[in-house]
Amino acid sequence: MLFRSLAKSGKRVLCLDMDVGLRNLDLALGMTDCALMDFTDVLFGRCTLARAAVEHPKLSGLFLLTAPVHFDRQAITTEAMQALMKQILNQYDFCLIDCPAGIGQGFHLAASCADRAILTVTNDTAALRDAQQVVLQLRPYGLPAKLVVNRVSRWMVRKIQMNVDDAMDMAGLPLLGVVPDDRKVPVANVKGELLVTQQNRGAARGYANIAQRLCGKRVPIGWK
């Protein structure tokens, strides 16, 4: 949802799906039938970046460059990904990489061509322990990293007694933003809709605030 908020603010944004073999960012964006080329087509010169990156049909400025379904991961090198990122940054204001789950080759390829990292976690011990491991793996790349705490509710804070400050301490990261728990999010995902275009509160408001901070604006951190 962050990429949607950035695009809505007038930025030219590319979503790069790097989950090779398990891509699903096209589903989240409602662009299943739109993405015909993937980033390996650009890497190996089969088409241009302008042709492979598809603009969202309902939100101007939001583009998707998807991952391949079947491909030899060993053929995708760090040098090739860094060259691709140079192309991307010449044409877009932001490139948000959807990093694959786990700490494997896809994770390290994504880290090698990024200039910062955003860790999105829920406010529970298991997720925060995973975040600690990710932070350790990111250190060799020298990437500045920040934390987004997702699905936060006042009820959870009261019952579990674990608040956002606790999450920051456990992950060892500064806070970029807080996203409230919002029942509209799974409904919008199932329908392939852009929640941020429907409302300006709840999770959409949380991500809009994060987008403004990424653009250098000072926005208070809080949730409703």
Question: How would you label these PLM feature ranges?
Answer:
Residues 1-2:
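Short, small-residue-biased leader/transition segments that mark boundaries at the very start
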Residues 83, 87-90, 94-181, 186-187:
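Conserved catalytic-core segment of NTP-binding enzymes
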Residues 190-224:
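NTP-binding/hydrolysis catalytic cores, primarily Walker-type P-loop NTPases
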Residues 5, 41, 52, 83, ...:
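Alpha-helical scaffold segments in soluble metabolic enzymes
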Residues 5-15:
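Post-Walker A helix-loop "phosphate-sensing" segment adjacent to the P-loop in P-loop NTPases
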Residues 15-90, 187-196:
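P-loop/Walker-type NTP enzyme "switch/lid" segment
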Residues 36, 50, 78, 82, ...:
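Amphipathic alpha-helical transducer elements in NTP-driven molecular machines
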Residues 17, 25, 42, 98, ...:
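Residue-level signature of catalytic and energy-coupling elements of molecular machines
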